[in-house]
């Protein structure tokens, strides 16, 4: 606002004078603020910028570490799964081998038992044949003695026995 003069008129340059002083005051205030306030504010903003950049770098490093740990964990998990599969495969193979071994032993034992039984049957059959021949010889001698009503001498006895055994052997076998 223009300042009125004592004569009541407002000078034309009165406002200019006030504007000039306002400009000078503004420039002085600006210089003082630049000197005393700009430096600390600028330093504070720079520190804040550095802190934010540091936090971002740290966050990026943490992100990379987490990614690396995730990859290692995935790798370890895959390796563990592979080891588990190998253990299962080895156990399955061992079980299969054990089963085959047990089956082979059982077959071998059954073959031995069967062969032993066959040998025992064969021996019993041979024994029965011998006993049957002995019985047949005794019966033949008795029958011959009764038929001839006399005792048979050794040569006759041997001839009769041989003949009877041969005939009986043909019939039995």
From Swiss-Prot:
Keyword vocabulary terms for this entry: ATP synthesis, Cell membrane, CF(0), Hydrogen ion transport, Ion transport, Membrane, Transmembrane, Transmembrane helix, Transport
CDD domains reported for this sequence: ATP-synt_Fo_b (cd06503)
Database matches in InterPro entries: ATP_synth_B-like_membr_sf, ATP_synth_b/b'su_bac/chlpt, ATP_synth_F0_bsu_bac, ATP_synthase_B_chain
Membrane topology of this protein: Single-pass membrane protein
Molecular functions per Gene Ontology: proton-transporting ATP synthase activity, rotational mechanism; proton-transporting ATPase activity, rotational mechanism
Transmembrane portions of the chain: 12-34
Pfam families: ATP-synt_B (PF00430)
Record's subcellular location: Cell membrane
Primary site of residence: membrane
Cellular component aspect of the GO annotation: plasma membrane; proton-transporting ATP synthase complex
Record function comment: F(1)F(0) ATP synthase produces ATP from ADP in the presence of a proton or sodium gradient. F-type ATPases consist of two structural domains, F(1) containing the extramembraneous catalytic core and F(0) containing the membrane proton channel, linked together by a central stalk and a peripheral stalk. During catalysis, ATP synthesis in the catalytic domain of F(1) is coupled via a rotary mechanism of the central stalk subunits to proton translocation.
HAMAP family: ATP_synth_b_bprime (MF_01398)
Subunit details: F-type ATPases have 2 components, F(1) - the catalytic core - and F(0) - the membrane proton channel. F(1) has five subunits: alpha(3), beta(3), gamma(1), delta(1), epsilon(1). F(0) has three main subunits: a(1), b(2) and c(10-14). The alpha and beta chains form an alternating ring which encloses part of the gamma chain. F(1) is attached to F(0) by a central stalk formed by the gamma and epsilon chains, while a peripheral stalk is formed by the delta and b chains.
Family: Belongs to the ATPase B chain family.
Name this polypeptide is given: ATP synthase subunit b
Organismal lineage: Bacteria, Bacillati, Bacillota, Clostridia, Eubacteriales
